[in-house]
Amino acid sequence: MIKGYEEEEWIPKTRLGRLVYEGQVTTFEEAVRSGLPIKEHQIIDLLLPGLEDEVLDITMVQRMTDSGRRVKFRTTVIVGNRDGYIGIGHGKDVQVGGAIKKGIENAKLNVVRINRGCGSWECGCGQAHTVPYKVSGSSGSVRIYLMPAPRGLGLAAGDVAKKVMEMAGIKDVWTRTEGSTRTTLNFAKATYNALLNTITVRS
């Protein structure tokens, strides 16, 4: 919990929130199968209590208004359990703590369960340690390609992509990138979008 911010008692406002609160939906998979949108971060708190969070970036944003210059902080945050679940979110607030808190809450609303496997022809161990096949994702000018790697290789990736994949439970991967990977926000989001494609299409 962030210092200075206490969690308020949760009173569910959505149908899915009430189902989770009342114990009628008890797993993340049941929540997804319900077809109901996850709009309250407390749903994830109850269904995935072991999530970790990590702040990838904090930037100061200045804006001129009629009353003068206003300063806000913008954060990029990831959450995950290092075993298949990953989410990314952004937060803005006049205080750093508030921006981090909002980033964590938004990241929880974007949690997905990715598919992992042993997709490398060099390996064949059968364990879920890498991506199941080649996938790619983009955000802004950044595009990243994730390719299956043999067990023990590690994460051949830039620092930001490495943190996202570690949080998702990917242990070995080859990567190739295009665009300005120095932009933390786009690099992290492109990596997240690539991991999303392990669920949807095979490329």
Swiss-Prot record:
What's the superkingdom here? Answer: Archaea
Q: Name one GO cellular component term.
A: cytosolic small ribosomal subunit
> Which Gene3D superfamilies does this UniProt record tie to the protein?
3.30.160.20, 3.30.230.10
Record GO terms (molecular function): rRNA binding; structural constituent of ribosome
- The answer to keyword Ribosomal protein applying to this record is yes
Q: Which UniProt keywords apply?
A: Ribonucleoprotein, Ribosomal protein, RNA-binding, rRNA-binding
Which GO terms of type biological process are on file? translation
Ranges for the S5 DRBM domain? 51-114
| Pfam (any one) | Ribosomal_S5_C
* Functional description taken from the UniProt entry: With S4 and S12 plays an important role in translational accuracy.
Q: Which family does it belong to?
A: Belongs to the universal ribosomal protein uS5 family.
Q: What binding partners and quaternary form does the record give?
A: Part of the 30S ribosomal subunit. Contacts protein S4.
Swiss-Prot/TrEMBL domain comment: The N-terminal domain interacts with the head of the 30S subunit; the C-terminal domain interacts with the body and contacts protein S4. The interaction surface between S4 and S5 is involved in control of translational fidelity.
Q: What is this protein called?
A: Small ribosomal subunit protein uS5
